[in-house]
Amino acid sequence: MRLKNKVCLITGAGSGIGKETALLFAKEGAHVVVNDFNEESGQETVRQICENNGEAIFIQADVTNPENVKAMVDQVIDYYGRIDVLFNNAGISGVGQLHDIDLETWNRVMNVNINGVFLVTKYVVPHMMKQQSGSIINMSSCIAEIGLANRASYATTKGAILALTKSIQVDYAKYNIRVNALMPGTIFTPFVEDYLSKDPNPEEAVQSIKRRQLGGDLGKPIDVAFAALYLASEESKFMMGTPFMIDGGVVNGKLG
């Protein structure tokens, strides 16, 4: 097992990529800490893990709330004594052209997607420093590398996460802490499915996205989960401050 007895904290693990990653990590022997704002969905992830003889606990917390985050990290340390892997997966989308976005909406996307990563990492890192080990996986996006219409706020956050990843890797490498970023393309999560269903022509919207993929299909949450597993495991011990693309060739095709 690639993560046997590793304590892995995954934010936003109630659905989509976070849930799929939690299930996979548990199969690989990890003690999974499932975090989500939605208690029902988070508990369902834990139920499925335990049903398959894995180990997991659920902690409800809002990643934008410092008190919530500190209490969550303290609870993990009290229960397991350490945190080996942090997957900063929680995030929200932002849709709209810049001139149409109001400040409240802009700040909400910044708060969840940037401040959430900052806060959870801030409270986890001191424990990894004491351990002299750890792997931090931040969720960026291939949108940080290419332009995409109507995604100004979301793209801003994902570019920031990539910069943050590279910067803090320099700070914490001496503590044997690795910090890397996942950069998925369009992944067919429940959120994306719901978003596409609201398009005037859902089928054409799906086909349009598929045409941008060199592989001709949409990604699935498990595709990203396997990449996260690699970054969480010792197999990736020489990857530090690295953007890891799982984009179906979108960036390569765009640049080509």
Model-derived regions: residue spans:
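Alpha-helical segment proximal to the catalytic Tyr-Lys
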Residues: P126, V170-K174, K237
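Active-site helix of classical SDR
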Residues: T121, T157, T165
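Substrate-binding pocket helix/loop in short-chain dehydrogenase/reductase
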Residues: Q97-L98, T105-M110, I209
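Conserved glycine-rich cofactor-binding loop
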Residues: G14-G16, N38
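Residue(s) in the substrate-gating loop at a strand-loop-helix junction
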Residues: S141
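Short, small/polar-rich loop/turn modules that mediate ligand/substrate recognition or access, typified
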Residues: F87, A173, R178, M239-G241
